[in-house]
């Protein structure tokens, strides 16, 4: 059983890594996670990861026990694009408390979440070694989170989110693929950089001392590796993903 005293004694990072180690699949992970979080008076949790690309329809992965009808609605409405907790997670690793003010620019999202018993909560961003962003969301139907409680929860949620991201990445094949780095050769990186600077294939060929066909060959490989249909999209994705 989850004990606050044990977490404080071991340190929250060590504690959550140790209890998550018991889980052999996502069902077991969810049970262990809920047992811990219900001691903190939360009814629901979701661990979400949003792909950087494609820009207009990013892939969203959600794990936990959020109501299924809400998850389906969130995906169908593409709420990840306007969710302020997702936007926050891209620029900060600090937790953020839900409030009417936070969701003032997306009232439909906030209203529908409340209708699904997700009334009071917080979001805790975390980052893995590939720089991918995950967001842990904790929610409950009743009892607003006071500022004092929020402060006390900060070290707990930070440790939980980091351990959860590592465990989910180990268990789920789609997330492992999502977290896999694309490997570009040195020549491909040069082609990407020169293209980003506005150079044509002919100009890049002159600069690099190769023929235009060779540059175009590198472009095709880059597009295949990064999942782009043309070189403009390839450069945009490469910049967004931090490859150049």
Curated annotation (Swiss-Prot):
GO terms for molecular function: DNA binding. This is Transcriptional activator protein PhzR. The keyword Cell cycle does not apply. Keywords: Activator, Antibiotic biosynthesis, DNA-binding, Quorum sensing, Transcription, Transcription regulation. Positive regulator of phenazine antibiotic production. May activate the phenazine biosynthetic genes by binding to a DNA sequence upstream of them, or to an intermediate gene which, in turn, interacts with them. Residues 177-242 form the HTH luxR-type domain. PROSITE patterns: HTH_LUXR_1, HTH_LUXR_2. Belongs to the autoinducer-regulated transcriptional regulatory protein family. It comes from the Bacteria. Residues 201-220 bind DNA. Gene3D superfamilies: Transcription factor LuxR-like, autoinducer-binding domain, Winged helix-like DNA-binding domain superfamily/Winged helix DNA-binding domain. The gene is phzR. The keyword DNA-binding applies. Pfam families: Autoind_bind, GerE. GO terms for biological process: antibiotic biosynthetic process; quorum sensing; regulation of DNA-templated transcription.
């Amino acid at each position: 059983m989850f004990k606050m005293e044990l977490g404080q004694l071991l340190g929250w990072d060590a504690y959550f890594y140790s209890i998550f180690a018991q889980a052999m699949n996502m069902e077991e992970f969810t049970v262990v996670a809920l047992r811990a979080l219900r001691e903190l008076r939360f009814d629901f949790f979701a661990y979400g990861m949003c792909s950087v690309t494609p820009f207009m329809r990013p892939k969203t992965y959600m794990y936990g026990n959020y109501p299924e009808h809400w998850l389906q609605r969130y995906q169908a409405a593409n709420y990840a694009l306007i969710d302020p907790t997702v936007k926050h997670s891209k620029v900060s690793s600090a937790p953020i408390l839900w409030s009417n003010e936070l969701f003032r620019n997306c009232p439909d999202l906030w209203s529908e979440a409340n209708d699904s018993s997700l009334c009071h909560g917080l979001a805790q961003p975390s980052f893995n070694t590939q720089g991918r962003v995950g967001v842990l969301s904790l929610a409950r139907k009743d009892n607003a989170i006071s500022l004092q409680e929020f402060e006390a929860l900060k070290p707990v949620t930070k440790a939980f989110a980091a351990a959860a991201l590592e465990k989910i990445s180990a268990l789920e094949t789609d997330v492992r693929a999502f977290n896999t780095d694309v490997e570009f050769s040195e020549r491909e990186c040069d082609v990407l950089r020169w293209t980003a600077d506005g150079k044509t294939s002919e100009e890049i060929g002159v600069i690099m001392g190769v023929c235009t066909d060779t540059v175009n060959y590198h472009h095709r490989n880059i597009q295949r590796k990064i999942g782009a249909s043309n070189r403009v999209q390839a450069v945009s994705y490469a910049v967004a993903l931090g490859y150049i």
